[in-house]
Amino acid sequence: MFAKKIRELRNKKGLSQEKLARLANVSFITIVKIESGESKHPTIQTMAGISRALEISLDELIKDIQLRKK
């Protein structure tokens, strides 16, 4: 699940939700909603910002989502 992956990667980096939001240039509420599963379809811009903040490629961030859709 996308929400779980974001939370796990964020925790692994030692980032708070607030810090991740700042680094990704998105609102704190956006991160909260994504991690809680409330926001199931974040924009590509949001996902790109999060991937940059987590220092992983966008492909790596969304690959599990792509695999489940097949």
Predicted regions and their residues:
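Conserved hydrophobic/aromatic packing and binding residues within compact polymer-binding modules
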Residues: 6, 20, 31-34, 61
